[in-house]
């Protein structure tokens, strides 16, 4: 790709039309933070409270979704699985972690992070959300934001074409 340089003398005023610049620029950025405690022992995916509406500015835009959940288990041999959806479209299961409870009451899995580059192909509002389920048929349950200080987050970043 050829580089274009722009030399400006001091005191120049006006605007530069963005149509002259290449794609790949960052459009809007939306951040959602959630500290709602949720637990499940079900093997079926259910919505977490981490959900955010987003309206792309062009049908050619891509949306980079960056999610992070604080994951725990209540006890026993269990695990957690997380997946990402755009409205009702499943974008994929990204996290499956689990294991035995350590040191009696230690139940942390830690931070589960995942990234996804979506092409929603719309200028209408869409909603990105995560779902969770108990991953292992064990005796315990999976939790997000379980300690009272934990927070999960979702950052949505529009990449302009």
Predicted segment positions?
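Short, solvent-exposed loop/turn segments enriched in Ser/Thr/Gly
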Residues: 46-48
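Terminal beta-strand-rich extracellular "head" domains
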Residues: 32, 38-39, 44, 56-125, ...
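Glycine-rich, low-complexity segments
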Residues: 1-37
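Extended, low-complexity regulatory regions
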Residues: 50-52
């Amino acid at each position: 790709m050829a580089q274009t340089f722009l030399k400006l003398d001091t005191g120049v005023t006006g605007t530069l039309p963005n149509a002259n610049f290449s794609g790949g620029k960052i459009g809007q950025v939306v951040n959602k933070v959630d500290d709602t405690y949720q637990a499940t022992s079900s093997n079926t995916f259910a919505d977490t409270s981490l959900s955010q509406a987003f309206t792309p500015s062009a049908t050619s835009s891509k949306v980079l979704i960056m999610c992070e959940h604080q994951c725990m288990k209540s006890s026993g041999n269990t695990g957690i699985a997380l997946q990402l959806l755009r409205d009702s479209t499943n974008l994929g299961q990204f996290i499956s972690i689990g294991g035995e409870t350590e040191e009696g009451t230690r139940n942390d899995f830690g931070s589960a992070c995942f990234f996804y580059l979506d092409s929603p192909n719309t200028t209408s509002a869409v909603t990105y959300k995560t779902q969770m389920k108990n991953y292992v048929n064990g005796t315990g349950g999976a939790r997000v934001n379980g300690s009272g200080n934990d927070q999960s987050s979702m950052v949505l970043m529009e990449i302009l074409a």
